[in-house]
Amino acid sequence: LLCISCCVSITECCQLMSGCAVEIKS
């Protein structure tokens, strides 16, 4: 799965602000 984030850091967004991130199938 790839993570598309509306935050600056994709990793931080996925871990800390999941509500700001969207997981999609690759």
Swiss-Prot record:
GO terms for molecular function: ion channel regulator activity; toxin activity. Expressed by the venom duct. Keywords: Disulfide bond, Ion channel impairing toxin, Neurotoxin, Secreted, Toxin. The keyword Disulfide bond applies. Contains 3 disulfide bonds. The cysteine framework is C-CC-CC-C. This is Turripeptide OL49.
